[in-house]
A protein has these predicted regions:
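Flexible inter-domain connectors and hinge/loop segments
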Residues: 2-384, 462-480
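Juxtamembrane interface at the cytosolic side of transmembrane helices
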Residues: 390-436, 460-472
Length: 480
């Protein structure tokens, strides 16, 4: 009796587990897992970047995104001014390169007379190159009594024995100005706020100048205990200072260059089919920050000029060279190539404008559990996860329609619309996350989304075409 009851229960349990519904559920689980596995392997290939595809697409994504959002970047242009020692300055005042120390001191004294907030000199002075070096060092020291004077430094060159030798030029300059590093290892389109060198941490130019700026302003960046070791993604604006037309000979080129999102995006779409000359015309020709020629400060009226006073007072001044053939250049996605001093100035403007909300480039994951060195950040992992989900869903739907060996067995229009809406939500999530982390890899994400949509829309079009042909054939048969 008990044996028969046990057999009956066993048959019921077995029938329940091998029912058609359970089999269908197992098949769906298998195909879902198989689809996600395929998507996961593809995302891992992108994430681990064996061919450099991730870095290339990330870099291009940033260039496009920084350009199309340039109009919406509310940059505090009134916080900085750039002074360029250009060819006009050298030729009009019969100078030579490098400019002699007496002329540099004259420029510095004139700027100091207008009470700037701070001064940065983007000139690496490793050895004395003309007479008057001691006079220049003394001028730096006197001007530094009124406001901080930061001088460019190469940490690899400034060995301890140079800085400790009283007869060495670098020692004399270190006693007269604040040496600040201007070169670092790493990605050239990133601006670190701090540098670790030989076990010591140094602030870069933008961070040092901003710290001085915050002494008279309410800044949140220095109120936290964060190490600020995540480099900045420098944002660029496509507007120019209202007072730019009063200085430099740029009146023919400084016209309104504010582009809408669509216009900026269209520029990158057609850039592949245009020449370098045509691309140059699309770039913003005006400097991103109010820019003066150093010749203004070598004129006889340089010490009592109200126009100069209005644009120098309480601003951070960045001094640098602008010469043809210079290798100290930075590439702006909005302006093209600019002199290196603009990189420091624009990074400072980013800090003034965004404070602690500046766009960060997240560091690679430390103590990576899956590899010796993880060349990706947590934000990269988030992007890879979202890419896996989008691609996995599309592969699952594609596998679902092919199980019966028929491409006409396409997903319904409702399923397709839901998938598209899901993709839009994913993109919105990435857009929200990147407000604090910087531009996402939109090229990779968009490419995967388009591939996923194309896999689904092809069978839908085939089914729609077959239905139309069937109706047409049916209509003809009735007429016959």
């Amino acid at each position: 009796m008990l044996i028969n009851q046990f057999k009956n229960v066993f048959k019921k349990v077995r029938g329940m587990f091998i029912s058609d519904g359970f089999k269908r559920l197992c098949r769906q689980f298998f195909w879902g897992f198989y689809s996600l596995l395929q998507a996961f392997l593809i995302s891992c290939f992108i994430l681990f970047n064996p061919l450099g595809l991730k870095n290339t697409s990330q870099e291009q994504s940033e260039l496009v995104y920084l350009d199309v959002t340039a109009s919406s970047f509310d940059a505090r242009l009134d916080s900085a001014v750039v002074v360029l020692i250009d060819e006009y300055t050298i030729e009009s005042h019969n100078l030579t390169y490098p400019v002699d120390y007496h002329s540099l001191a004259r420029i510095l004294r004139a700027i100091n007379g207008y009470n700037p907030n701070s001064i940065f000199i983007d000139i690496l002075q490793s050895y004395p190159h003309s007479n008057g070096f001691d006079y220049w060092a003394n001028t730096l020291k006197r001007v530094g009594q009124n406001q901080p004077v930061f001088l460019a430094q190469d940490l690899d060159f400034d060995k301890s024995w140079r800085l400790n030798d009283p007869n060495n030029a670098r020692h004399k300059l270190s006693q007269s100005a604040i040496l600040t590093p201007v070169s670092w290892r790493g990605e050239p389109n990133r601006y670190p706020l701090t540098i670790n060198h030989n076990g010591e941490t140094y602030q870069t130019v933008a961070m040092s100048v901003y710290e001085e700026f915050c002494k008279t302003s309410d800044c949140q960046l220095f109120k936290s205990n964060e190490p600020h070791d995540e480099p900045m993604i420098v944002r660029w604006n496509n507007r120019y200072s209202d007072k730019q037309l009063d200085f430099l000979n740029v009146k023919d080129r400084c016209h309104s260059n504010q582009r809408s999102f669509i216009e900026a995006f269209g520029k990158h779409v057609v850039s592949t089919f245009q020449s370098k000359e045509e691309l140059a015309e699309l770039r913003v020709q005006c400097p991103p920050i109010l820019t003066l020629s150093a010749s203004e400060f070598l004129e006889e009226s340089a010490t009592d000029n109200q126009a100069l006073r209005d644009v120098i007072k309480d601003r951070a001044v960045f001094i640098g060279y602008k010469l043809t053939g210079s290798s100290d250049l930075v590439t702006s996605p909005v302006h093209g190539q600019l002199d290196g001093v603009f990189f420091h100035a624009m990074a400072f403007v980013n800090l003034v404008s965004l404070d602690e909300d500046y766009w960060r480039s997240q560091n690679a994951i430390e103590n990576c559990p899956i590899a010796k060195n993880c060349d990706f950040s947590r934000f990269d992992l988030y992007q890879a996860l979202l890419q896996t989900i989008i691609l996995g869903v599309s592969i699952y739907l594609k596998n679902h329609q092919l199980r019966d060996d028929s491409e006409v067995n396409a997903p319904s229009t409702g399923v397709f619309i839901i998938f598209v809406l899901f993709s839009v939500i994913v993109c919105a999530v990435v857009l929200n996350i990147q407000e604090a982390t910087g531009p996402a890899n939109w090229i990779a994400l968009t490419s995967i989304t388009l591939i996923s949509v194309s896999m689904l829309i092809k069978p839908m079009l085939m089914r729609w075409t077959q239905q139309k042909l069937s109706k047409l054939s049916f209509g003809r048969s009735q007429n016959i």
